[in-house]
Amino acid sequence: MANLKAIRDRIKSVRNTRKITEAMRLVAAAKVRRAQEQVLSTRPFADRLAQVLAGLQQRLQFENVDLPLLQRREVKTVALLVVSGDRGLCGGYNSNVIRRAEQRARELSAQGLDYKFVIVGRKAGQYFQRREQPIEATYSGLEQIPTAQEANDIADQLLSLFLSGTVDRVELVYTKFLSLVASNPVVQTLLPLDPQGLASSDDEIFRLTTRGGSFTVEREKLTSEVAPLPRDMIFEQDPAQILSALLPLYLSNQLLRALQEAAASELAARMTAMNSASDNANALVGQLTLVYNKARQAAITQELLEVVAGAEALNG
C-alpha cells in the first residue's frame, strides 16, 4: 500500500506541474499577441520616417555632406550588441544566441580586430561575465515587450561608443523570429548606417492565430510605397542638418524592431518548451497511471490469494 501511495503522490505532483506549464504556455501566447500588436502600432511612424529619410537622401545625393553616422572608417574595434533573455524555460533560445555571439567574436579575432560586448539580457550578461569577456555595458530587467524608451537608451550608448571613436563598427546579434518552432540567430550591422538601406521599407509582419485547436503563425509580406518629397518643398533648416538629426531616430527605430522580434522569438520558444513539457507530463501521467493500476491489481490479487489460502487452511 505504501508503494501505491507513492505512485498516487507522483501522479498528483505531475498533474500540478502540468497545470503550471500549461498556464505559462498561455501567458506566453498572450504576450506574443501583444508584441505583434506593438509592431503594427509602430509601423505608420516607421513608414513616414522612411519616406522623409528617402526624400532627404535624394535631395542631398549630389552634395558632399559630412554625416558621421554614415561615415565608414578603418575598423579596429567592433561592438557586439547581444540580445538575450532574462529568464530560462525557453528551450535553446539563450544558448543559441550566445553561441552565435561567441562565433562572431572568434571571427573578429581571426581578422585581427578587437571587440567589446554590449549585453541585453541577464542570461548573456552572466555567461560572458563568468568568462571575463570585455563588456562595455549591460542592460537587464527590460520589459518583456520592449519599449521605445528602452531602445533609445541602448541606441544612445551605441552612438556614444561610435561617435567617440571607441568602436568603429556596431554589430547586432539577435534572434530573428521565423515561426513558433523555428528561430535563427543572425548578425546585422547597425553602425555605420547603410545609406542604401535607409529607404528600404519592405517588411514582414506576423500574426498569432489558432487553427484546429492549436496556435499557428501567419506571416504577411508588406511593401510600402515610399513617396518622394515634392521637389519644390522648402526646408526651414538645411536638409543635411535635418537628416543628421533624423538618423539617430532611425537607428532607435531599427533597434526597437530588432528587440521586438527577439522578444517574440523568446516568447515563442517558451510557448514551445512549455507545450512540450505539458505533452511530456501527459505521457508521464499515463505511464504512472498504468503502473498504479497494475500495482493495485497485483495487491488485490495477493489479498485474494491470502484469503483463499487462509480459508483452505481452516478447512484442512
From Swiss-Prot:
Tell me the membrane topology, using the record's own terms: Peripheral membrane protein
Give the record's family classification. Answer: Belongs to the ATPase gamma chain family.
Residues folding into a coiled coil are none
Q: Which SUPFAM superfamilies match?
A: ATP synthase (F1-ATPase), gamma subunit (SSF52943)
UniProt keyword Ion transport, yes or no: yes
Quote the CDD domains the UniProt record gives. Answer: F1-ATPase_gamma (cd12151)
Q: Which GO terms describe its cellular component?
A: plasma membrane-derived thylakoid membrane; proton-transporting ATP synthase complex
Q: Which Gene3D superfamilies does the annotation name?
A: 3.40.1380.10, ATP synthase, gamma subunit, helix hairpin domain (1.10.287.80)
Oligomer status and interactors:
F-type ATPases have 2 components, CF(1) - the catalytic core - and CF(0) - the membrane proton channel. CF(1) has five subunits: alpha(3), beta(3), gamma(1), delta(1), epsilon(1). CF(0) has three main subunits: a, b and c.
UniProt xrefs under PANTHER family: ATP SYNTHASE GAMMA CHAIN (PTHR11693), ATP SYNTHASE GAMMA CHAIN, CHLOROPLASTIC (PTHR11693:SF41)
What is the designated name of this protein?
ATP synthase gamma chain
Described purpose of this protein according to its UniProt entry: Produces ATP from ADP in the presence of a proton gradient across the membrane. The gamma chain is believed to be important in regulating ATPase activity and the flow of protons through the CF(0) complex.
Look up and give the organism this protein is from.
Synechococcus sp. (strain ATCC 27144 / PCC 6301 / SAUG 1402/1) (Anacystis nidulans)
This protein's gene is called atpG
Keyword list, A-Z: ATP synthesis, CF(1), Hydrogen ion transport, Ion transport, Membrane, Thylakoid, Transport
Where does this polypeptide localize?
A: Cellular thylakoid membrane
Say yes or no: keyword DNA-binding present. Answer: no
- Top-level division of the source organism's lineage: Bacteria
Molecular functions (GO terms): ATP binding; proton-transporting ATP synthase activity, rotational mechanism
